[in-house]
């Protein structure tokens, strides 16, 4: 033990401080893991909402296409007025 203390400069006080610092780091890691899990769940929920909204948007776009009369030319097909 004295050799280890001499080689690494570890004393009982230093050992207690290291143990305390390790315990604090373990608590911080545990807290961060919880936060990461919460963020992951929020991200999953947001992606679900985005997917649902994209599906709804495609549905609305298809309905608009169906409502558009076939006999009306698109803006690209229209000839410009004579004053152009």
Swiss-Prot record:
InterPro entries: SlyX (IPR007236)
Domain of life: Bacteria
Gene3D superfamilies per UniProt: 1.20.5.300
Entry-linked Pfam families: SlyX
Family to which this protein belongs: Belongs to the SlyX family.
Entry protein name: Protein SlyX homolog
Species per Swiss-Prot/TrEMBL record: Mannheimia succiniciproducens (strain KCTC 0769BP / MBEL55E)
Organism classification: Bacteria, Pseudomonadati, Pseudomonadota, Gammaproteobacteria, Pasteurellales
The encoding gene: slyX
